[in-house]
């Protein structure tokens, strides 16, 4: 499965969440609402989730192995960094 599109919506407010992302796979399937979050060790992604009645968050969609997660995270963070650097050049 190939990542064929990554769309970034940057978040301008102060806080740990830096962007919301949609990723398209094989030009056929899209996953919306992946979050780019700034943690103590740098940027990482959080898959879309919902809050259960007991207050726990459960992923709606997520990769089932480490390789897939790393591939998705790398593509998202590269697109995010590119979007941020283009904003700096324009601004």
Swiss-Prot record:
InterPro entries assigned: SpoVG (IPR007170), SpoVG_sf (IPR036751)
Keywords attached to this entry: Cell cycle, Cell division, Septation
Gene3D superfamilies documented for this protein: Stage V sporulation protein G
Keyword Ribosomal protein: no
Pfam families, sorted: SpoVG
Coiled-coil spans in chain: none
Alphabetical GO biological process terms: division septum assembly; sporulation resulting in formation of a cellular spore
Function: Could be involved in septation.
Family: Belongs to the SpoVG family.
PANTHER family xrefs: SEPTATION PROTEIN SPOVG-RELATED
Protein name as it appears in the record: Putative septation protein SpoVG
Originating organism: Clostridium beijerinckii (strain ATCC 51743 / NCIMB 8052)
Phylogenetic classification of the source organism: Bacteria, Bacillati, Bacillota, Clostridia, Eubacteriales
């Amino acid at each position: 499965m190939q990542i064929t599109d990554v769309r970034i919506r940057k978040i301008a407010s102060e806080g740990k969440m830096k962007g919301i992302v949609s990723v398209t796979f094989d030009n056929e399937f899209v996953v919306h609402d992946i979050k780019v979050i700034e943690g103590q060790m740098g940027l990482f992604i959080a898959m879309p989730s919902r809050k259960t009645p007991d207050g726990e968050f459960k992923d709606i969609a997520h990769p089932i192995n480490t390789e897939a997660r790393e591939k998705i995270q790398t593509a998202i963070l590269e697109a995010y960094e590119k979007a941020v650097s283009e904003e700096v050049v324009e601004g």
